[in-house]
Every structure is written in structure tokens, then in C-alpha cells.
Curated annotation (Swiss-Prot):
Top-tier EC class: oxidoreductase
Comment field (misc): Perhaps the leader of the small subunit serves as a transport vehicle for both subunits.
Similarity comment: Belongs to the [NiFe]/[NiFeSe] hydrogenase large subunit family.
Protein name: Periplasmic [NiFe] hydrogenase large subunit
A Pfam family annotated for this UniProt entry: NiFeSe_Hases
Enzyme Commission designation: 1.12.2.1
N-terminal signal peptide: none
Key words of the record: Iron, Magnesium, Metal-binding, Nickel, Oxidoreductase, Periplasm
Amino acid sequence: MSGCRAQNAPGGIPVTPKSSYSGPIVVDPVTRIEGHLRIEVEVENGKVKNAYSSSTLFRGLEIILKGRDPRDAQHFTQRTCGVCTYTHALASTRCVDNAVGVHIPKNATYIRNLVLGAQYLHDHIVHFYHLHALDFVDVTAALKADPAKAAKVASSISPRKTTAADLKAVQDKLKTFVESGQLGPFTNAYFLGGHPAYYLDPETNLIATAHYLEALRLQVKAARAMAVFGAKNPHTQFTVVGGVTCYDALTPQRIAEFEALWKETKAFVDEVYIPDLLVVAAAYKDWTQYGGTDNFITFGEFPKDEYDLNSRFFKPGVVFKRDFKNIKPFDKMQIEEHVRHSWYEGAEARHPWKGQTQPKYTDLHGDDRYSWMKAPRYMGEPMETGPLAQVLIAYSQGHPKVKAVTDAVLAKLGVGPEALFSTLGRTAARGIETAVIAEYVGVMLQEYKDNIAKGDNVICAPWEMPKQAEGVGFVNAPRGGLSHWIRIEDGKIGNFQLVVPSTWTLGPRCDKNKLSPVEASLIGTPVADAKRPVEILRTVHSFDPCIACGVHVIDGHTNEVHKFRIL
């Protein structure tokens, strides 16, 4: 029953419930900001044995950009996504910076990095509370909670004071909402009526629900921090080829405004997000057994020198088959995009600088093609990118901050590093990354202030547009490795390719039929209720594909369509 703990196996790890169902399950659409996602799985005796990930919306930005001024790229590519818009602006700007050969000033690097830090904090808070937590939290079970008991639990896991009155107010508001019969985003949620895959007790559900509401208000602060230097959010307007345009970012007033918003956001991360993550993770330790992948790639992030990836606070690296004793250096020439199973002309794998975007829609699985996404590969292998890749590689490289936070999380949960290769590990890594970046923003901010105090007020460098050039911009966005690739011809965009985190993780098979990370991660996932496959969505959501709208689940035996809302 929802709100009750699952039966525990020896060692205190819950036994994950599963059904005896065999047949297909289709979740369509699983939507996100970049487009729509369709997940199709084959289940045998209650476990997933095969999976297909399909992006069902054509984007076509690469086609739109051809023939335009390279400086305009950032304004178009930001519209790829309404959440992490700045990362695309940064990737496009770095891409053209690289093509024209300009070295940007120190202050510009600091300002770009600070806005990116705020972007990370905003994205990861929103993901945990509003896109992923409700795969684990039963909001309606919070109505059964004792607010006084819940307040004691909250105070035991966080230094923040939480009163019974505060939680009672949330519970009363929730009760009124439920009794109205108009559940809005919770209509037909998986947990309504109870679901065996939800384990949290009522008090923990009440605490999480209260923090869900608080995070709605808090994420505005992180977004505002981005706008302090970025002019607005979403779709910032301060990056230009050669640096930034925001001269007011040099003033004490604007710096103080950013600093105040960062401090408030960091306090929430330290006192709310991380404690909540640890409580949820402790209850769902069985999810350290599912959702893992083998290959990882990160471009690293927060550079001192834009031209040196190894100057980044997080270093780049590549790992195959979980061999973290043998971290490979990143080589941009080893990236290829495969289209054999995508709705594009041809079947040849191409490096992004030679990439083509020529649509060829068949139908679902016609000619074995089933997605508008291409399939990026590194040395021919599918690679997971994102917080888990960045944390695992940084940990293995001996990154002191990452090691300290990761070891503390693992010790608190009583598990070893191997537990990170999982759905739960991916979710925990996002929290670890958030905590490390939240602290590092303060370090960067102080360095920026010190640099200004030395009399440096330069924020942009001059440059000239070449007739012919190639460039690439690498950003480790909140969802992972993002790269923009440009070929300039006669001073205009001759070709432009975006290789985004979601194509790395959520793309289709390649020409060698190797599954993408999300497809591979779903194999072996238990499903307790085929009509409410929350387990599938736990793993899909752990990659952070911004879920927002309605979903249909098709029963393979009856062809009955079950409609419900992703939470």
C-alpha cells in the first residue's frame, strides 16, 4: 500500500515489487522541453527485457541556421529549450569564439561561469522536486501524517527549524485541494489509491510535499540570479563573441544582488535538497540495483581558460566498461552521430563537422527507423553523460570536493561507490554535483571580485570574422555534454550541428544496433503494475528529460489505453 515500507531483504534493502505481466508497455508521449519522448518496452514476467527510445518531434534548428551570421547562432539555439536556455547560448558563443580565434577576457570568463553555476542550481532543484521526486513521493499519503511527528523528523535531518504548525498548514492546504476533487497536475497520478512501488511513510511524504511547494518559490531566486548578469531568464542576452556585454556586472550593487540570491539558494541546497535526497535514497536502496550503464563521458566545466578543457574545475574524461582506473583523455575527433535508426537520409556515421540534417520520415520502425534523434557515439560506443558521469569521473580523478561530498553521501546511506551505477546513483550524483557547484560559485565570485579590485574592467575582446573557419563549443550542461559545431563559409554559417545531452542519453540504437544509455538502463527494470509503470519513469526521469504532459499506456493484451499524468 502507498505510504508503507516495502518488505526488506537481508541488509535492510527493500524487495522491489514486480508483477507477472508479460507484454509491451508504451509510454507516449513522455514530453520534455526539447521535444517529445516515446518509450516502448517489452516486459517478460514483470521485468523489462527490451526497450526503444523515440523522439517524436522534429527540431530542425541546424537547417534554420544555414546562411545566417554566426553571431546570431546563440539567439536561435537558446530556443531549443525553455529550461536550460543559457547553456545553448554559451555553447554557440564558445563555438564561434573558437572559430574566430578570440581569447576572451578574465572577467567575461568569470561572468559566464557564474551564470552557468546559477543555471545548475536552478535546474537541479527543479528536477529533483518537480520532475523526479514524485516518482518516489506519494503526495496524498501526506494527509495521514502526524505533523508533530513529521516536524521532529524534519528537524532531525536538517539544521533548519521546522514546526508542526508549518507542516499542519501544508497538510490543511493539501486536504482542501484533494477534497475539491480538482487535483490538477496530480489527476490520475500513479500513487492515487495506493501503489506497491511507493515506500515512504506519511510523515516523510508530508515533509517532501512541503519542500515541493517551497522549491517552487526558491527556484525563482536561482533564475533571478541568472538574470542579474544575463539580462533576463529564460533566454539570456549578455553573451557575445569575444566576451559579454553586461558592464553593470562590474558594479558592487549587481555583484551584491547576485551574491544574496546565491546565498539563499545555497542554503536551500544544503539544508533542504541534500537532506531530502538522503532520506528518499535511504528508503529506496533497492534502486541501486537498476538503471545502470557502463560508459561515461564528460567535457568538464567552469574553465579558467576557454581554450583549455583541462583548465576546468571539473576535468573532461572518458570511461569505458566502468574501468575508472583507466580514464581516457577526451578527443573531440572521436565523436560521430549515427542515423541508421533515425529519420534522416543515409546510414553513414558522421563527425559533427561533416554532419547532415536531411529529414526522411518513414513511420515508427519503418526501415528500422524510430526516432528524430541521431545516435551520438564516442569511438563507436554509447556514452552516458550528465551528473553521474561528471561525478564518477571527478571522483576517480581525485577531485577533493567531489570525493568529500560523495564519500559523505555513501557513508550516510551505508553503500559503496558501486551503488552509484544505478537509477538512484544517478539521482544522488545530481545532488552531489549541486552541492559542489553551490560552494564553488562562492569561490568564483570571490575571485571575480578580487580581479575587479585589481583594476581590471575589460569584459570583451576585439576580433574579426574570417571568411572560412571551423569551431566547436563544449559545455557540460546540467543534463550533460553539450557541443555546438560550426563551419563558416564566406563569413556565414555553412553548417551547424548541435550534439546535445539528450541525444547522447536518450537517442536510438546506432548502426551496430547498440542500445542508447536510456534503452540499456531500462533492461531488467521490474514493473509492479503495467498500467502505472512508475518504475520505467523513475529511470527515464533520472536522466532529466523535463517531463511535462500527458502519457498513454497501452495494455498489450487488451489494447486498452490507460491515460494518466506524468509527475
